[in-house]
Amino acid sequence: MSVLLRSGLGPLCAVARAAIPFIWRGKYFSSGNEPAENPVTPMLRHLMYKIKSTGPITVAEYMKEVLTNPAKGYYVYRDMLGEKGDFITSPEISQIFGELLGIWFISEWMATGKSTAFQLVELGPGRGTLVGDILRVFTQLGSVLKNCDISVHLVEVSQKLSEIQALTLTKEKVPLERNAGSPVYMKGVTKSGIPISWYRDLHDVPKGYSFYLAHEFFDVLPVHKFQKTPQGWREVFVDIDPQVSDKLRFVLAPSATPAEAFIQHDETRDHVEVCPDAGVIIEELSQRIALTGGAALVADYGHDGTKTDTFRGFCDHKLHDVLIAPGTADLTADVDFSYLRRMAQGKVASLGPIKQHTFLKNMGIDVRLKVLLDKSNEPSVRQQLLQGYDMLMNPKKMGERFNFFALLPHQRLQGGRYQRNARQSKPFASVVAGFSELAWQ
């Protein structure tokens, strides 16, 4: 959520609003359990004032306001994760998930020449559980990493979540003095003695040999939604319902909008979602990896350019009408991995997307589960491990709903030599762990 761009759309005038002829309803618009009345939340009041002042807003602007508004945003002050929150992520389900990702980063570090230093950068770290599990693996394999200087860099816009992350990962957080010229708003040392810093924007993270992690990050970036009509593509906007006070509705723009430029000329779907912010971040990651090496690993809900309407809300672990009580529920849209691949623009190689159950099986989740089960004599612990495994791997649960996607230097897949410095002159191994069934055989 670090690189958020405005759509460039000007306000629609009253005449244009009056000309919008139809209402659009997406398949996720209603959960079937919406309340009879729309609770008037502070965010709803804010949005209605904004729309009355400037006209209907894009879905992207709606998502941005609802999730990251500095005063009322869902992500800014809420702890929405875990059993008491609105959704649970893979790291909260099983420690094995983070452990295998830690192994993946070490595998890539070894395969690309064992640099004497690297940065671990996570975008949107949640409660810090995932990076904590990864760091535990780094500690357990300290003999392998003993000659490598590691630092952790977290990109987080939520003050509430950054405080939780600090409690999870450090002995004592050390806030910096508020300095407009400093890109770091908090820093400290992890429980294992690794320097850790917090940023609000990926651009502020120091460039260098880095491994980037984005787990359930891209799915909350604002999307523009478009519907194909007899007149061509028309963007979906959010407007005030003239028939019902304190209620929002979807409408279609009466004419083309600038964001239409993001749609592929040969697009065959009737409804598409595009995320310019995701493209900006992928471009940044690609440039960094091409220049200084490393890799990026993305794990998220998504598809490879096949799905249409995926915009939905979650509240208390249930689907929630995206226009009801804004600010009280998470908003998300599936990641279009084909778009991420295009935005890499050939600067780096890409792998995936592949299903989560395939990636984790290739990473050795079955072996790791057996080791943990053999070590545990507690029935409750064993049951928890098995339930976590089922949630991660079952195709009807997370196994096929989540995908893994990676960005790597071209040399990594070509078996060539890495030319950045002499310390990394060994040929790359062409097999990439997780993306090949041969990875651990």
Swiss-Prot record:
Transit peptide, from-to: 1-46
Subunit structure: Interacts with NDUFS2.
GO biological process: mitochondrial respiratory chain complex I assembly; peptidyl-arginine methylation, to symmetrical-dimethyl arginine
Name of protein: Protein arginine methyltransferase NDUFAF7, mitochondrial
Keywords, comma-separated and alphabetical: Methyltransferase, Mitochondrion, Transferase, Transit peptide
Family from the record: Belongs to the NDUFAF7 family.
GO CC terms: extracellular space; mitochondrial matrix; mitochondrion
EC number: 2.1.1.320
Major localisation: mitochondrion
Function: Arginine methyltransferase involved in the assembly or stability of mitochondrial NADH:ubiquinone oxidoreductase complex (complex I). Acts by mediating symmetric dimethylation of 'Arg-118' of NDUFS2 after it assembles into the complex I, stabilizing the early intermediate complex.
Pathology linked to this chain's protein: Defects in NDUFAF7 may be a cause of susceptibility to pathologic myopia, a genetically heterogeneous disorder characterized by extreme, familial, early-onset vision loss and described as myopia accompanied by severe deformation of the eye besides excessive elongation of the eye.
Recorded catalytic activity of this chain's protein: L-arginyl-[protein] + 2 S-adenosyl-L-methionine = N(omega),N(omega)'-dimethyl-L-arginyl-[protein] + 2 S-adenosyl-L-homocysteine + 2 H(+)
Localization in the cell: Mitochondrion
InterPro entries: NDUFAF7, NDUFAF7_sf, SAM-dependent_MTases_sf
GO molecular function (one): methyltransferase activity
